[in-house]
């Protein structure tokens, strides 16, 4: 019993010896990481900029948040000139000012710039110093929408991934305009003055990484030629396109979303949209008289405000394959000339349908199908989601198709 009573004391002595052994040990020396390369902002990840050990330099006209020292905010300040940009700045925000020129001087030391936002200013092409952007070898994102550009602002650095030029006055794209931009994934040219002649030299053909192309609110009468097979999102709303060649999309197998509302489409070849990855198809506000084949991948179909009198389900779904079902969940068909609802055969062909929006029809002002909105097997959560989706799309199609937000919402 005497020996047992001394055991706790022996344990304490052993612990003390172990502690003394490591008392002077520097754990930081053991786990110090080797010198790291400077952290660069990646627009596709959440940045975690290391804290600066000293006060960061910032232009007096701007604000540099201590928590994000690599960003400089100069927006909404009625600036007429671009201030000098410190070397450490990676994100520069100059939108919503009165800037008319982009001289090279302020960018002399800005070698680490990754993103520049110059949208909503008064910049003209001839007021941009030649090569001012091309010298920024780390630049990946450039916003120049809502300015007064008459021409494409080349040359640009090969590092560029996102180029936003919507709402300018650009009317021409020469064949070499986009040369040297192999990394471009998003190109926005909505709300410009482009017509078919601007695409004669096939300016998009060599953009092998292009995934999103926005050409809405222009003057196109035909489909743009030779688009790259990498394309996933194509926006052509508010043009004057009247025809889609039968095999046009055969070279665009990765298309996820296609928006062609507010055009002059009348007849569409039956299998035009037989695409393996298509999720959203918007053909509202055209002159269509009949439907077409629906690919199995499609989830949302918008064909409102057309001249469709009858929806032939057998055209949309010529055969049923129990092991390979269609994924269509939402159809919008209001403002057509329907007098009867879609055949119940549609629910065998499209077993995932949750909502069909009939709304008012154009037979006469008072024509309205008995059920304005058909909803099938909806849980309360699904009901709220369907309602929200419909309200959101209403706003997009009726209010925002000519506004600033012409970008696809992310699917994933």
Identify the residue ranges that each predicted region occupies:
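Terminal targeting and flexible regions in eukaryotic proteins, enriched
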Residues: 1-71, 75-76, 88, 98, ...
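Leucine-rich repeat domain C-terminal region
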Residues: 194, 199, 270, 274-394
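Conserved hydrophobic beta-strand positions in leucine-rich repeat
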Residues: 72, 92-94, 116-118, 139-144, ...
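Consensus "Asn ladder" position of solenoid repeat domains
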Residues: 77, 97, 121, 144-147, ...
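Leucine-rich repeat
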Residues: 80, 100, 124-126, 150, ...
